[in-house]
Design a protein with these regions (language model features):
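Histidine- and acidic-residue-rich, metal-dependent catalytic cores
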Residues: 1-122
């Protein structure tokens, strides 16, 4: 089952290469492809489908990847309960959801505080 799930980045990326001409821009097509294909890559190379690591992972895919992990944590799923935002940020920071760029973790934490998703620490 997990092997089937791990195919979705490849399927999504292939779909972005079949957009009708004139519907989108070349740059948007590139970003769409990179996000679809690489949003499950992890900074330490442990992700999929290509095992990219660090800055080999396009920044747009890194951003979507960390936000996707956060969203998965704070929402109920059939296989797990949802976590509070503070716990989700802690889990991401501690690498419990795979490795992310320290800079992106700082950005996510700052955004969460700014939007009052987290309790502000004085």
């Amino acid at each position: 089952e997990m092997n089937v799930v791990k195919q979705h980045p490849l399927v999504g990326a292939a779909m972005t290469q079949r957009f009708p001409e004139g519907v989108t821009t070349e740059k948007l097509n590139q970003y769409s492809y990179e996000i679809c294909r690489h949003h499950h890559e992890r900074y330490d190379g442990s992700g999929y489908p290509d095992g990219l690591k660090g800055n080999e992972i396009p920044i747009c895919a890194q951003v979507v990847g960390i936000v996707d992990a956060y969203d998965a944590l704070i929402n109920d799923r059939p296989y797990k309960r949802k976590y509070e935002p503070e716990e989700a940020i802690r889990m991401i920071s501690n690498g419990e959801c795979g490795a992310f760029s320290k800079k992106l973790i700082q950005c996510l934490t700052a955004a969460a505080k700014q939007k009052n998703w987290l309790q502000r620490q004085n």
